[in-house]
Amino acid sequence: EDIPQPPVSQFHIQGQVYCDTCRAGFITELSEFIPGASLRLQCKDKENGDVTFTEVGYTRAEGLYSMLVERDHKNEFCEITLISSGRKDCNEIPTEGWAKPSLKFKLNTVNGTTRTVNPLGFFKKEALPKCAQVYNKLGMYPPNM
């Protein structure tokens, strides 16, 4: 018999922010994690779109962040958005292709006290020269070819 679980009163959303040194739109072996980046977590009611929760967080060492979310936000749509990078040489917020400036998700599958989300990345101004080798290993063409 299924026993209904009590609503979660608080939990953590955690993830990482990285510098996309190859401007690939995903983590590569040359990516570097960014301490000191800021992000915003915002949840909205799925019925009327009203904002129900907003929190700003900052990355620590290894680009890790963890934000405490108060109360249950089941059946709401939430989004984590990049605000600013901790690195001047890697602060371009991606807007097209595979890379996105934000990550959208629903909080209806929270089990326990932590929810880990996919990493978000800032683009380096220009790709590192070694990136051609990375793309070659992956069997891909570098962007802008």
From Swiss-Prot:
- What's the effect of swapping C19S? In strain: cv. Bella de Espana; variant 3
Q: What is the effect of changing Y135F?
A: In strain: cv. Bella de Espana; variants 1, 2 and 3, cv. Rowghani; variant 4 and cv. Zard; variant 2. In Ole e I.3 and Ole e I.4
This one is known as: Major pollen allergen Ole e 1
Q: What is the effect of changing N48K?
A: In strain: cv. Zard; variant 2
The effect annotated for Q10A is: Loss of IgG binding
Q: Where in the cell is it found?
A: Endoplasmic reticulum; Secreted
The free-text domain remark for this protein reads: Regions 91-102 and 109-130 are immunodominant T-cell epitopes. Mutations in the C-terminus (135-145) reduce allergenic activity but do not change the ability to stimulate allergen-specific T-cells.
Consequence recorded when altering P142A? 20% loss of IgG binding and 95% loss if IgE binding
What InterPro entries does the record tag this protein with?
Allergen_Ole_e_I_CS, Pollen_Ole_e1_allergen
Upon changing C19Q, the result is: In strain: cv. Bella de Espana; variant 2
- What disulfide bonds does the UniProt entry report for this chain? C19-C90, C22-C131, C43-C78
